[in-house]
Amino acid sequence: MSLRTKVIAALTGATMLGGAITGVIQHNEGLSLTAYKDSAGIPTICYGETKGVKMGQRASLSDCQKQLIQSAGEHAKALDGLPMQLSDVALLGALDFTYNVGVAGFSGSKVKADLKRLDYAAAAKSVLAWRYISKYQQKSPGTGWVYKGSNRWTFDCSQYINGQRNKVCWGLWERRQWQSKAIGNQYKNVNAAVSALTKYGG
């Protein structure tokens, strides 16, 4: 049995882990029945779905719930290669992280490399490095953006602007903090991990 099989079984079998997976993604992504552009300018719908999404697109709640289970199962393929001993809490955090950064992003990350060694502390630290968003345009998108060359601008989502939490992507930073604790196996169980979401804005 692989971790991907475990996730799919949890999602389709309505288990505690399956409920936690969908609950975390729903909380962290939020729900939109109409397509919108996320903080990086990518068309998004339902619970953070970006694949094949076009502006103007609409979906029903039922469509979004089905899509979430299917998409979470597809994202679970990024867990291939991780040890079966990976805790459910770390698995929950890793799947939410993958849902946000994509299968390729997680698969090539230091986070996954750390989890392969079951080095939860290192993985927790590695997650926090994923706090930047990028935009490609000639002029600065605004305060706090840093030019990286070739019309690429980056924004550190953990930064304060004029003493206030930034309004660009602070929610992403809060999500990374929760993911860091989950991937770091710092919650007692999946229920405690889900309950901890209320501390963060999501």
Segments predicted by a language model, with ranges:
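Solvent-exposed coil/turn segments that connect beta secondary-structure elements
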Residues: 48-50
